[in-house]
Amino acid sequence: MSRYTGPSWRISRRLGVSLSGTGKELNRRPYAPGDHGQGRRQKLSEYGTQLREKQKLRFTYGMTERQFYNLFKRAGKIKEGTHGTNFMILLERRLDNMVYRLGLATTRRQARQLVNHGHITVDGQRVDIPSYEVKIGQVISVREKSKDMAIIKGAVEAVVGRPQYVEFDADKLAGSLTRFPQREELDAELDDSLIVEYYNR
C-alpha cells in the first residue's frame, strides 16, 4: 500500500484528528467529508474502532501500511515495556518526526520533504531517509547551505513549545533527542491498546 499523498484535511475530518497538528481542519467542519457529513452518526463495530485508531496513528506519521506494520512487529520484540508504548516510541524516533518535534518544520509532511531533499544532517552527515531511527544524543541539524531557507526560518519562529525529551539550539538550528519519551508525553487521546488488538486479532 502506497503512502497517501492527497489532501490531509479529508483524512483529518474522516478520522477526527488533525494530521497537520494545527487543528485548522477540524475547526470549521468537525465532521466527515461529504454533503451529509454533519448529520452522520455512524456506530462503529469493535473492529471498526480498532481500525480507525490504527489509521489515525498511521496517517499522523505519514507512513505506508507496510512501514507501519513492520515497525509494529519490531516493537513487539522489545522485552521491556508494553508493546503499544514501545511502538509509539519507535514512531517518535523517526527522523522526519524528530525534525518536526524540533520545530524545523510546521508539519510532519513538511519535515519529511526536508529530509528527502537532503536538507537535514545527523551528526554532521546528510541523511535523506525519513524513517532513519534517531538515537539519544545524536545531533540533528540543518545543512549549512539550507539554513537560510524561509520555510525553516518560518517554522522555527512559529514554535510555541517543544517536548521535554528534546533540546534545541535556535542559533545553530540543531537539536537532539535527550531521552525516550514517556507514554503520557505522547498522544493522550490515542488508545494504542486498540492498535495492538487490531494486529493481534
Curated annotation (Swiss-Prot):
GO-annotated cellular components: small ribosomal subunit
Signal sequence coordinates: none
InterPro entries named in the record: Ribosomal_uS4, Ribosomal_uS4_bac-type, Ribosomal_uS4_CS, Ribosomal_uS4_N, S4_RNA-bd, S4_RNA-bd_sf
Keyword terms: Ribonucleoprotein, Ribosomal protein, RNA-binding, rRNA-binding
Entry-linked SUPFAM superfamilies: Alpha-L RNA-binding motif
Gene3D superfamilies: Ribosomal Protein S4 Delta 41, Chain A, domain 1, RNA-binding S4 domain
Annotated TM spans: none
Lineage top rank: taxon: Bacteria
Region ranges (Disordered): 21-43
SMART domains listed in its UniProt record: Ribosomal_S4, S4
Biological processes annotated in GO: ribosomal small subunit biogenesis; translation
The S4 RNA-binding domain, residue ranges: 93-153
Pfam family, one: S4
MF (Gene Ontology): rRNA binding; structural constituent of ribosome
Disulphide bridges, residue numbers: none
rRNA-binding is among the record's keywords: yes
Family affiliation: Belongs to the universal ribosomal protein uS4 family.
Record text on subunit structure and interactions: Part of the 30S ribosomal subunit. Contacts protein S5. The interaction surface between S4 and S5 is involved in control of translational fidelity.
HAMAP family (UniProt xref): Ribosomal_uS4_B (MF_01306_B)
Job of this protein: One of the primary rRNA binding proteins, it binds directly to 16S rRNA where it nucleates assembly of the body of the 30S subunit.
Protein name, UniProt field: Small ribosomal subunit protein uS4
Species, as recorded: Levilactobacillus brevis (strain ATCC 367 / BCRC 12310 / CIP 105137 / JCM 1170 / LMG 11437 / NCIMB 947 / NCTC 947) (Lactobacillus brevis)
Gene that this sequence comes from: rpsD
